[in-house]
Amino acid sequence: MARKGILGTKLGMTQVFDENNRVVPVTVVKAGPNVVTRIRTLERDGYSAVQLAYGEISPRKVNKPVTGQYNSAGVNPRRYLAELRLDHPDAAAEYEVGQELTAEIFADATYVDVTGTSKGKGFSGTMKRHGFRGQGASHGAQAVHRRPGSIGGCATPARVFKGTRMAGRMGNDRVTVQNLLVHKVDTENGVLLIKGAVPGRTGGLVMVRSAIKRGEK
């Protein structure tokens, strides 16, 4: 069986009780339905993957090149397109163009990896962005309490090294959280209850895939 994946929407967090009456914090993800719009094979494309489409959108908001992709697949335009890389070249045979994927594909899954876009924090200083300690609060410190300090030498090396941690835009990055437990799969409503937090804001797009490090199929 190929590694499974589906596009969905983060609906927010809540808490449920397990069989031992312990509180479990879960993230509610509306998973799918997705439709397969293209299958990439090792022979033709150099890698194995399936292209998934998700979300409603008015056809007049889709440009002509993208509309042509949907027309060739014989499906209505969707808001999002993403590729799911397959872990084995023969796994593409398990999919076909026009096939619909729902939350039911994770009925037997135990752990998943969730990818999303983290919340943007705006321009942030080094203490918030990188966890710097800051400088002295007193004993002669004047208006330098939250400054980063030295960023390099003067004559040598006479430059700032690439990758130096400094203030800047924080968040709005692609983030993957691995090995999250699937607490429940509600196939009737197309919802996944995933233990713990997943990246992104409420209403954000997420990709849920079977956990690669645990060998989930």
UniProtKB/Swiss-Prot annotation:
InterPro entries to which the protein is assigned, alphabetical: Ribosomal_uL3, Ribosomal_uL3_bac/org-type, Ribosomal_uL3_CS, Transl_B-barrel_sf
Sorted UniProt keywords: Ribonucleoprotein, Ribosomal protein, RNA-binding, rRNA-binding
Alphabetical list of Gene3D superfamilies matching this protein: 3.30.160.810, Translation factors (2.40.30.10)
SUPFAM superfamilies, per the entry: Translation proteins
GO BP, sorted A to Z: translation
Highest taxon of source: Bacteria
Entry GO terms, CC: cytosolic large ribosomal subunit
Gene Ontology MF terms in the entry: rRNA binding; structural constituent of ribosome
Matching Pfam families: Ribosomal_L3
Record function comment: One of the primary rRNA binding proteins, it binds directly near the 3'-end of the 23S rRNA, where it nucleates assembly of the 50S subunit.
NCBIfam families in the cross-refs: L3_bact
The protein's assembly and partners: Part of the 50S ribosomal subunit. Forms a cluster with proteins L14 and L19.
Family: Belongs to the universal ribosomal protein uL3 family.
HAMAP family, per the entry: Ribosomal_uL3_B (MF_01325_B)
Descriptive protein name: Large ribosomal subunit protein uL3
